[in-house]
Curated annotation (Swiss-Prot):
Quaternary structure annotation from Swiss-Prot or TrEMBL: Monomer.
Family matches, as Gene3D superfamilies: Arginyl tRNA synthetase N-terminal domain, HUPs, Isoleucyl-tRNA Synthetase, Domain 1
Reaction equation(s) it catalyzes: tRNA(Arg) + L-arginine + ATP = L-arginyl-tRNA(Arg) + AMP + diphosphate
GO molecular function, one term: arginine-tRNA ligase activity
The species this protein was found in: Psychrobacter cryohalolentis (strain ATCC BAA-1226 / DSM 17306 / VKM B-2378 / K5)
Motif placement: 'HIGH' region: 132-142
Pfam families linked to this entry: Arg_tRNA_synt_N, DALR_1, tRNA-synt_1d
GO biological process: arginyl-tRNA aminoacylation
Enzyme class: ligase
Protein name: Arginine--tRNA ligase
SUPFAM superfamilies: Anticodon-binding domain of a subclass of class I aminoacyl-tRNA synthetases, Arginyl-tRNA synthetase (ArgRS), N-terminal 'additional' domain, Nucleotidylyl transferase
Family affiliation: Belongs to the class-I aminoacyl-tRNA synthetase family.
Amino acid sequence: MSQAQIDTLTSLFDSAIAVLKNDGELPADWQNNSQITRTKDTSHGDFASNIALTAAKAAKANPRQVAEKIVNALPENQDIRQIEIAGPGFINVFLNTEAKFAVLDDIFNLQNGFGLSKQFDGQKIQVEFVSANPTSSLHVGHGRGAAFGMSVSNLLEAIGYDVTREYYVNDAGRQMDILATSTYLRYLETNGETVTFPVNGYQGDYVSDIAQTLKTQHADTYVHRFADIAENVPEDAQFEINADGEKVLLSGDKEAHIDGLIANSKALLGNGYELFLNAALSSILADIKDDLNDFGVSYECWFSERSIDSEIEPVLQILEDKGYLYEKDGNIWFKSTDFGDEKDRVVRRANGQSTYFASDIAYHKNKFDRGFDKVVNVWGADHHGYVPRVKAALLALGIDADRLDVVLVQFVALWRGDEKVQMSSRSGKFVTLRELRHEVGNDAARFYYVARKPEVHVDFDLELAKSQSKDNLVYYIQYAHARVCRVLEKLETSGLSVDDAIGAAQQELLVAPSEEELIKLLAAYPATLMRSATGYEPHILTNYLKELAALFHGWYDSNRILPVSLTSGETPSADEMAMMQARLRLSKAVRQVISNGLGLLGLSAPSSM
């Protein structure tokens, strides 16, 4: 059943419900939230509806009795061969032969547009994803957010949304100061100063590379003695490794130490401090942009945290005017518990500095001020406690919190054999997204990042992702596409060609159970795409493509598409030619849908493998 036919069937049931309401069998305000689903067993029809079960309570009747009334009220339709009531009250719909093949017509007519919808046409939605601190290269954990966010954005566009992809650049705050100071200390080293590098500094080689560039550009212009920078700074943390291999703090305070170095660096450098901050920021941000672009991830907007500095105080004033702020222990608190949060939150510290949460309130207000109907935040799972406070702030500002959806993406564990690779951006020892892509390829990375529900951890098997076997789902799905391309190449070599008109005229020859299953699964693609998009669940699409590829491979291995006579130099019979064109039509339809689905996930559809 094509999407148009699904819409028609939905309309038929709506008409029947209208009759029941008019006859007083159902309340006039009853809302139809039933589903039309593809049946797994063809003996149960092509599609089934649970509408009678959902209406039974409102109708105050047995579901089977309600089903009988609905069936009797259904308008006639030429595509429907038979309707049966099954089990507790399911309504099974059997299509006639011609209607079953309508999906093939849709696929060939719409091609790349098959499955797309305009249901949400005109609605603006923003998807913010990755938004990693610009303090180091992206690691493999960030890659999952990138693949997920881009796939979700593509899916939302496919159902009609006007999508804005956004990266929130955290270019303000303490982490940037740690980066700037780390860069400055490495700059001193390149100029011959002996530096005791802080435990809490960013220690990767990329910081030294940035510092070397600054030395080339500015020589020793900004050099100060390290002794002056470390003057009166609290002792850094000192650790030892105990008998169990655990790191144990002996003395010192790494946070107080780095804060002291930051303060002294700012005082000694004056305006020059911004040079180091901006140089590090621009270098790392450029690297992030290049990395994501190479990964097939792009954005309409790179939004700077600094750009909303001027919006923080006005938004806090709004909350104060509404009576949602109060002072306690010198801090200014937001009454987030009034809106369901577990505790109130500080928005301005006693020293007068606003908190990161205050900045986030201003940022989210800014999002809705820009006219988005809906906003989707793709966050790491460690941000789960942050969701209630952000929604509380929206409610306090008079913004419908349901317009914000937050998807929490779990972490990625990367395995090399039996060894689990650990990551730490400050130590400089982490596996980057770029390294992963170079090892397994973009397609494998993009697929396995989204192949599971976002709330489920991913154990990324490098060896599996590189293998050429049916166990590697990326290879398995892409190979189905390549197989069809190979068949068409063989056909061309034999001097024959695909005749779509003959294929369409002979498609009723496709009566084998495996062929009927393939056609039914192709018909399910539009609904699958819609469900995957509206639920922000690209794994639904990956599972569909896996099922489609498996059905195709099984059918391909059991049935000849090209007649044996072609390889022996004989002329195929008329019956063989008719079946060949029908099966070529089905094969091309499978290829088209696989290509469409892979494209939405950001994967290639190779013609040979």
